[in-house]
From Swiss-Prot:
Keywords: Ribonucleoprotein, Ribosomal protein
A GO molecular-function descriptor: structural constituent of ribosome
Record-linked InterPro entries: Ribosomal_bL35, Ribosomal_bL35-like, Ribosomal_bL35_CS, Ribosomal_bL35_sf
Protein name: Large ribosomal subunit protein bL35
Entry's family note: Belongs to the bacterial ribosomal protein bL35 family.
Organism: Acinetobacter baumannii (strain AB0057)
Domain of life: Bacteria
The UniProt record lists the keyword Ribosomal protein: yes
Pfam families in the record: Ribosomal_L35p (PF01632)
Entry keyword annotation includes Cell membrane: no
Native organism taxonomy: Bacteria, Pseudomonadati, Pseudomonadota, Gammaproteobacteria, Moraxellales
């Protein structure tokens, strides 16, 4: 059986942990002037990938 290829863009976006995959928050790159300080602060850090999306991430990144 042939080796599976990893989707490189996905490999850079997700990190495997013991409890699933973690990812960065969206909506934090640009157009920040109209967003409140509270909202920007809450977008800080990482969150876990939702359960319904874990299978997709596993298919895209079979070796991480």
């Amino acid at each position: 059986m042939a080796k599976l290829k990893t989707r490189r863009g996905a490999a850079k976006r997700f990190k495997a942990t013991a409890n699933g995959f973690k990812r960065k928050q969206a909506f934090k790159r640009h157009i920040l002037t109209k967003k409140s300080a509270k909202r920007i602060r809450q977008l800080r850090g990482c969150v876990m990938v939702h359960v319904s999306d874990v299978a997709s991430v596993r298919r895209m990144c079979p070796y991480i």
